């Protein structure tokens, strides 16, 4: 696996010549990422906000990775994006990965749709994940555990640092409270020293917000509490959040 953001950053810059109209929410974590993304999207739709959501993997069709207001992108629109991306690959002499290509389809879709919110799930880690190139307005971290140790590190602190590197200067970093002191310190360090200069970001602190979640909470219970933290930041009403979630059908 290749680590680094230069290739995807170059392709993204070439494809999208203007800024996003969307508020971008970036979600990382070991488990529960997709559930949180779906919870955010369904309530935003309930509030009358348009959404584009990018998650992975898909269960049946690749188009499931990109959802417009909860529905997978249609095949024709997906294929049209592929043609644009292939043109950029040839122009810049790049060979993008499957994940990078599907992510760029989501970016093109959010940009074209001028969605109110673009909700994006990381693929692996955070610091070097392709999705890190986005100018996110909020970052969220779900539960953390030892995973992908060959890539992210051998300890919970190392893994936590890689995921917390999605923090953006001056923006909220909303994190499920953990009780490992070394992991807490790693997250606090990344939040204090947020920003990647190669992406044009200035260095500075993120606004770290810990969300207490009971032990044994299900992914949906976790998602509800984290979603409330996100919506509070954007001053969005959560009175009907439970009702929104009851209409959600999220496989996996």
Q: What are the language-model segments listed below?
A:
Residues 40, 106, 185-188:
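Aromatic/hydrophobic pocket-lining residues that form π-stacking "cages" and hydrophobic walls in ligand
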Residues 5, 9-21, 46-134, 150-153, ...:
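ATP-dependent carboxylate-amine ligase catalytic core
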Residues 114-121, 136-251:
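Acidic, Mg2+-coordinating active-site environments of NTP-dependent enzymes
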Residues 23-27, 35-52:
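A conserved segment at the C-terminal end of the G1
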Residues 52, 251-252:
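A short linear hydrophobic-aromatic micro-motif
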């Amino acid at each position: 696996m290749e680590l680094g953001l230069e290739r995807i950053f170059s392709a993204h810059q070439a494809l999208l010549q203007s800024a996003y109209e969307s508020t971008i929410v970036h979600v990382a974590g070991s488990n529960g990422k997709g559930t949180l993304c779906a919870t955010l999207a369904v309530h935003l739709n309930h509030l009358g906000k348009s959404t584009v959501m990018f998650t992975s993997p898909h269960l049946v069709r690749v188009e499931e990775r990109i959802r417009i207001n909860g529905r997978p992108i249609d095949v024709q629109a997906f294929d049209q994006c592929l043609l644009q991306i292939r043109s950029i690959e040839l122009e810049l002499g790049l060979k993008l990965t499957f994940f990078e290509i599907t992510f760029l389809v989501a970016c093109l879709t959010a940009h074209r749709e001028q969605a109110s919110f673009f909700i994006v799930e990381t693929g692996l880690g955070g610091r070097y994940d392709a999705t890190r190139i986005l100018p996110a307005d909020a970052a969220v971290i779900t539960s953390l555990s030892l995973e992908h140790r060959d890539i992210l590190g051998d300890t919970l602190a190392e893994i936590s640092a890689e995921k917390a590197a999605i923090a953006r200067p001056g923006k909220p970093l909303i994190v499920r409270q953990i009780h490992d002191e070394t992991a807490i310190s790693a997250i606090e360090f990344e939040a204090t020293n947020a920003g990647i200069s190669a992406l044009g970001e200035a260095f500075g602190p993120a606004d770290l917000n810990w969300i207490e979640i009971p032990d044994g909470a299900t992914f949906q219970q976790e998602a509800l509490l984290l979603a409330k933290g996100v919506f509070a930041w954007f001053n969005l009403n959560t009175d009907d959040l439970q009702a929104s979630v009851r209409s959600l059908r999220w496989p996996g």
